[in-house]
């Protein structure tokens, strides 16, 4: 009986050790893959379009504000010209949320 118990403890110990090594190998592979993806993303990054500048060439290129990304908003200006104009703008509800978070940060921090 003691032999079976000793053999069981040894088997559980070996199994836990081997599974821990496999998990370490998987974690290392995931970290390497994540780092390579981040490097590719940084190399692929392009200049963003500042607020109130023309974004008609790329509607997803607007810069980020402190918390939220600006949105490319298109409209037709008054004056009879039928040409669409697109600029990067911050929606009002997001502007108010940023102001509120700034006030809260100033109050507590």
Curated annotation (Swiss-Prot):
Transmembrane segments: none annotated. It comes from the Eukaryota. It holds the Pfam family Toxin_35. Keywords: Disulfide bond, Knottin, Secreted, Signal, Toxin. Disulfide bonds join 48-63, 55-72, 62-88, 74-86. Residues 21-44 form a propeptide. Residues 1-20 form the signal peptide. One of its GO terms (cellular component) is extracellular region. InterPro entries: Spider_toxin_CSTX_knottin, Spider_toxin_CSTX_Knottin_CS. Its main location: secreted. Expressed by the venom gland. It is found in: Secreted. One of its GO terms (molecular function) is toxin activity. Belongs to the neurotoxin 19 (CSTX) family. 01 subfamily. The presence of a 'disulfide through disulfide knot' structurally defines this protein as a knottin. This is U3-lycotoxin-Ls1x.
């Amino acid at each position: 009986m003691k032999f079976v118990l000793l053999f069981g403890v040894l088997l559980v110990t070996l199994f836990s050790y081997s599974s821990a090594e496999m998990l370490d190998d998987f974690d290392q592979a995931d970290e390497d893959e994540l780092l390579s993806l981040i490097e590719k993303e940084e190399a692929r990054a392009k200049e963003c379009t500042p607020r109130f500048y023309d974004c008609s060439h790329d509607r997803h290129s607007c810069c980020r504000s402190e918390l939220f990304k600006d949105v490319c908003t298109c409209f037709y200006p008054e004056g009879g010209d039928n040409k669409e104009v697109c600029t990067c703008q911050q929606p009002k509800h997001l502007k108010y949320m940023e102001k509120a978070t700034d006030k809260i940060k100033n109050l507590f921090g």
